[in-house]
Regions:
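OB-fold and OB-like single-stranded nucleic-acid-recognition modules
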Residues: 18-166
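Sec-dependent N-terminal signal peptides
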Residues: 4-13
């Protein structure tokens, strides 16, 4: 009797999971009422990326002082959001598909010309493959990630990056 009761209880909990799914109702057009709407990416500017301050912080693992970022409110609101950003492509390692997008051409970038760390963004591509040349001016779309703690990455990262065709 106890076994029968347990089986009946299990069936009553599991059975609803196997009911057929009814498709969502249609509107007068062809779109579904519950159709997801893709978020339009925010057109990010280098000016907005300047909403950050830096202070020197000691990193014992590398025995060096480095600049630690404190992101302003306007940039914090964009963390994890879809963005588009235009800049100059700087190849870091072609074989690893490692690229940086810079506010400035190579001769004036953060690495060579003395611009600040807020003027470069790491591109983490959704799909590897396309090769870019130094100083190609391109627009990329992806998810903005703010990085304050990983000293082996840049402060700004565009994850799942894709080039926007123009």
């Amino acid at each position: 009797m106890n076994r029968l009761l347990i089986v009946l209880l299990l069936v009553s909990f599991i059975a609803p999971a196997f009911r057929p799914v009814t498709p969502p109702a249609k509107t007068s057009g062809s779109a579904s009422v519950l159709a997801p709407v893709a978020a339009e990416p925010v057109k990010l500017s280098w000016e907005v990326l300047r909403d950050v301050t830096f202070k020197k912080k000691w990193y014992a693992e590398e025995s060096v002082y480095m600049l630690y970022p404190t992101f302003g409110q306007s940039i914090q609101k964009l963390n994890g959001k879809a963005v588009e950003l235009t800049g100059y492509v700087l190849p870091v390692d072609l074989e690893s598909n490692l690229y940086v997008l810079s506010a400035f051409p190579y001769s004036a970038c953060f690495f060579c010309g003395g611009a600040g760390p807020e003027s470069v963004v790491s591109l983490k591509f959704k799909k590897a493959g396309k090769k870019f040349k130094t100083d190609e001016r391109r627009t990329f779309r992806g998810t903005l990630k703010l990085n304050a703690d990983n000293i082996y990455e840049l402060n700004y990262i565009i994850a799942d990056a894709e080039m926007v065709e123009q």
